[in-house]
A protein has these predicted regions:
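N-terminal secretory signal peptides
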Residues: 1-8, 16-27
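Bacterial lipoprotein signal-peptidase II cleavage site
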Residues: 27-40
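Beta-alpha junction/loop-to-helix N-cap segments that form part of ligand/metal-binding clefts
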Residues: 38, 60-66, 74-144, 153, ...
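Extracytoplasmic "Venus flytrap"
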Residues: 48-67, 87-94, 116, 177-184, ...
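Hydrophobic alpha-helical segments within soluble ligand-binding/sensing domains
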Residues: 96, 152-171, 184-186, 212-216, ...
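Extracellular/periplasmic periplasmic-binding protein-like sensory domains
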Residues: 243-314
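Segments of small-molecule ligand-sensing domains
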Residues: 306-310, 321-379
Length: 383
């Protein structure tokens, strides 16, 4: 079995940083940059990466791409060279399908992504069991429904919603992006669990991407309803806006988010003191000692702290490498010819990942412990 700690410890971080940094420089800002060896050497396995590398959601896709690149370096061996090629989907389903087709033309044998839920649902519907797809952060049950070669690394919407409800014991305002599959899916699951648990949801507010520059109106209604906790399964950029708006209007409440909010402390221009006391359901913490080697390696290469999106994508590549080893496939074969064997291997492997101990069920959903953190003094503390 491939171990993260063994892999990270076997390499020179400085040498790895120089090698990866040099390649990234050659690729520049192009969305078609690749990592790895020559495809005709009999040792190269091609992994495509799809996510938003430009546009409003680019920060999530770029983080995932960086994590995947680092993993490709770490899990390549003398007999297995993991080659990566990234394509930009701008968090759009149609563009994600176009990106998938482009990667197929390149010779992709397995896919990491898409990063966002809507795009992942679109691509998984096109795969027809002809490609191993491991998405780092798409959480809807629709991603893997009726698919045999599609897998998730992040928690599913019901898991996140139900787990979050266990931590909520106040007057709650539910706040989510009604135009986003991830956000609305987790919100629905939370509301269902809240009803079963007899939690007190006093207000429900929504927004869409084109109205995410101010949430004063929604917060005013939540405050008037007496909400002391806002459960918001949203990404970290709108979360930073919400917290600033709340401070400006003097609304003292607790914000609770899910894994998409990880990265809040790194939002450019954000006053991180506003995040004090924020409760997060996320499988990864850069402050956790067990992730120290990965965090150091990531910082050495990218000069920034990794977030959950980077860690999830790293675990995707780790899982694919483990599945290749388990399946004992011909790594020069077409993706369609080996997808079934890789999928069978995915359901048998167990990896000690950055985001927990990961296994997968028959539906392709990840099974790992749900964890919660509270932000205190700019660090993640176990809740």
């Amino acid at each position: 079995m491939l171990s993260i700690n063994n892999v990270l410890n076997r390499r020179s971080f400085l040498a790895g940083a120089a090698a990866l940094g040099g390649t990234a420089a050659l690729a520049g800002c192009s969305s078609g940059g690749s990592e790895g060896g020559s495809a005709d050497d009999g040792k190269t396995f091609k992994i495509g990466v799809i996510g938003p590398l430009t546009g409003a959601a680019a920060t999530y896709g770029v983080s995932a791409e960086k994590g995947a690149k680092l993993a490709a370096k770490d899990f390549s061996t003398k007999d297995l060279k993991l080659s990566l090629k990234s394509e930009d989907d701008v968090a759009d389903g149609e563009k994600a399908i176009n990106a998938f087709n482009t990667l197929c033309d390149w010779g992709m044998q397995a896919l990491v992504g898409p990063v966002t839920t809507g795009a992942a649902v679109a691509v998984s519907g096109e795969i027809a069991d002809d490609m191993l797809m491991v998405t780092p952060s798409a959480s809807s049950l629709d991603v893997t429904k009726d698919k045999t070669t599609v897998f998730q690394v992040c928690f599913t919407d019901p898991t996140m919603g139900a787990s979050a409800a266990k931590y909520a014991d106040a007057k709650i305002a539910l706040f989510y992006n009604s135009g986003d599959t991830y956000s609305s899916g987790v919100a629905d699951a939370f509301a269902e669990q809240a009803k079963e648990s007899k939690l007190d949801i006093v207000d429900t507010e929504t927004f869409k991407d084109d109205s995410s520059t101010s949430f004063t109106n929604q917060l005013t209604k939540a405050k008037e309803a007496g909400a002391t906790l806002i459960f918001a399964p949203i990404y970290y950029t709108p979360a930073s806006v919400l917290l600033k708006n709340a401070k400006d209007m003097g609304y003292d409440m607790t914000l609770m988010g899910t894994d998409g909010m990880d990265g809040l402390l790194s939002v450019e221009g954000f006053d991180t003191s506003l995040a004090e006391g924020v409760l997060l359901m996320t499988p990864f913490s850069a402050d956790d000692e067990k992730n120290a080697d990965f965090v150091k390696a990531y910082k050495d290469v990218y000069d920034e702290t990794p977030n959950q999106f980077a860690a999830d994508a790293y675990d995707c590549v780790h899982a694919i490498a483990e599945a290749i080893d388990k399946a004992d496939i011909d790594i020069t074969a077409d993706g369609a010819d080996i997808a079934g064997d890789l999928a069978k291997a995915m359901r048998k492997i167990k990896i000690d990942g950055l985001t927990g101990e990961l296994t997968w069920n028959d539906e392709g959903q990840v099974e790992k412990p749900a964890t919660a953190y509270v932000i205190q003094d700019g660090k993640y503390i176990s809740a």
